[in-house]
Amino acid sequence: MTARLNKIDCITYQIREIEENDLNNLLLVKNEVSVHTERLKQQGDGHAVYIGAFINNCAVGYVLLSLDNKEDVMPYTNNAKCADMIDLLIIEPLRNYGIGSQLILACEEICKEKGILCLGLDVNPEDNPKAKRLYEKMGYHTVGEIHLDGVYEYTDEQGNKGKYEDWCIDMIKFL
């Protein structure tokens, strides 16, 4: 993947592969060392590409492109290999400036370079309707039924612990 520079008004940001020395920056976007470490390992093993958006070398967003087959969409792809976009995240103040779109385009470019003709993702349509609209605008369409993607523990601002059920739909795009 070739790093590229983009502009938001007068701010220049760079889309590029994340490197191990970016770990401290990533913690400003999402404070989960083990998640980032595992993703860097997957990238090192050739199973994924971890792509970030950076302003002045500070991470402002990222996405993990899993190159392993997204098995749950196989019935909808005529068994063509389908990569999986996971955990697209942009820091709140910089959302709606096109950074997410550029990360998606970078994933699509990498897939094409690797001969992968389908790209999939999961999105929670109830909790994240803006993301679903973005994916639709970029040519992704829903396949299958809504499903429980995971149950995640959280702690709210008052320190109360709870569990969140992430009900998602699969979306795919043929490249």
Regions found by a protein language model. Give the residues of each.
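Intrinsically disordered, low-complexity Ser/Thr- and acidic-rich flexible linkers and loops
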Residues: 72-76, 155-161
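Conserved beta-strand-loop-alpha-helix junction that forms the acyl-donor binding cleft
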Residues: 121-132, 148-153, 161-162
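Acetyl-CoA-dependent GNAT
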Residues: 8, 17-92, 104-105, 174
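Short hydrophobic/aromatic beta-strand or adjacent loop that forms the aromatic wall/cage
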Residues: 48, 164-171
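Conserved acetyl-CoA-binding loop of GNAT-fold acetyltransferases
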Residues: 135-145
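Short acidic N-proximal helix/loop "leader" segments that mark the beginning
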Residues: 1-8
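Conserved GNAT acetyl-CoA-binding A-motif
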Residues: 111-123
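Conserved acetyl-CoA-binding loop-helix of GNAT-fold acetyltransferases
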Residues: 90, 96-109, 133-137
